[in-house]
Swiss-Prot record:
SUPFAM superfamilies: S-adenosyl-L-methionine-dependent methyltransferases, Winged helix' DNA-binding domain. It holds the Pfam family Methyltransf_2. It comes from Aspergillus ustus. It comes from the Eukaryota. This is O-methyltransferase opaF. The active site is at 328 (proton acceptor). GO terms for molecular function: O-methyltransferase activity; protein dimerization activity. O-methyltransferase; part of the gene cluster that mediates the biosynthesis of oxepinamides, derivatives of anthranilyl-containing tripeptides that share an oxepin ring and a fused pyrimidinone moiety. The nonribosomal peptide synthetase (NRPS) opaA assembles the quinazolinone core with D-Phe incorporation. The first adenylation domain (A1) of opaA loads and activates anthranilic acid whereas the second A domain (A2) is for activating of L-Phe, which is then converted to D-form by the E domain. InterPro entries: COMT-like, O_MeTrfase_dom, Plant_O-MeTrfase_dimerisation, SAM-dependent_MTases_sf, WH-like_DNA-bd_sf, WH_DNA-bd_sf. Keywords: Methyltransferase, S-adenosyl-L-methionine, Transferase. Its EC number is 2.1.1.-.
Amino acid sequence: MARGAAELTQTRKVMIKEQLANLTALIDLRIADTPCNGLDDDMPMQPAIDNTITHELAKETYALLHAIKGPSLSVFNFGEQVMHVSAVRALFGLGVFSALPQDRQAMTATALAEKLGCDEELLVRLMRMCTIWGPFKEVGTETYSHTQFSLAYLDPQVTNQFQAFVDEFLPACLQLHKFLEINNGKPPVDATNCPYTLAHQTSGKDMWEHLAQFPKRSKVVNSAMYAISSAHPWPVALYPFREALLQLPPTSSNAPLVIDIGGGQGQAISVIRKMCGGINGRFILEDRPEVLAGIPHTLRGIEKIECDLFKPQPVKGAAIYFLRHVLHDWAEDACVRILQNIASAITDKSTQRVVISEMVLPEKGVTAECATQDLVTLSTTGAERSRKQWERLIPAAGFRVENIYSSEASCEAAIECYLE
């Protein structure tokens, strides 16, 4: 072996050993459960698992993979990842996840293809990739079974999130380079002209207008958003709603207390109302007509009012105007207009406020999860923002940042703003 090649091999060995040592140290730090510091068992103030350790462990695992493969082969990881997603989505569409025995008993490709009415050789080709990286297990020649990871896809909430990401946002993200080429490297600022509209050829419509033409797709996206909010309710409790409302003079039962603007199917406002039990006033959910009409469950003690983010806020004088995961869908100029429409409804600048529940990204060391979410929102003109970006955006709408409530275990935060 030539000296240069030998030195390169030795360098790779050192890198692999270093990465293994890093992983071992992180595994020792990995915690299974963190005591919740919340209002009750149903509403923790922070995630049960410290995500910072989870993400650091995943990051070091990827670094180990790169060290093992080396620079050249690592480039092709991207191709493998895309093909893996493609194969999983195809198998999902064929019905493989539902057809395999849920008790993890093995099934041959022949039996599976016959059950599904699909081509056996095609099935084998797709399962190759999905047994190398998962989620399925290859238990024999052209014989497969479920694993704990593939069974997760049978959860409707997981299913909707997977479909929404792969069918709606992945095509848009893969067109980002083309959008930037067409627009001279400038980020999208118009919801009718962005990577999403380019990928899906929406004919001048924004994402929501486009999806409204396809009820099944729209239902999947709305269900995915509901699943995300339902699975992660704890950020709502970062803001001390009860304490804030109790500091105000007593109100009548007709006074608007909290308005959840763009609140989807009411997950957040339901949590807030529970936190504020016994306090007089109205709790209001606002969203687009089709969203409110599609809520499948009863919202006790919560009013529903149709709204348009880009028109003046219809309910004046509320104690708290709440925006959760709304502004990250929009470019900065649009966010300013949304906040200004809320400002038009504020009648007392000293007591009434806006609370924004969004990510506040660190200036460095952003996790892969947060970076992924940021690029997903970029596809429709939005952004996950840093503190510096929020402190530029909010004053541009005439507000000041009073407090930022956050958790060390996540980038999620609650930004309290008052009108100047």
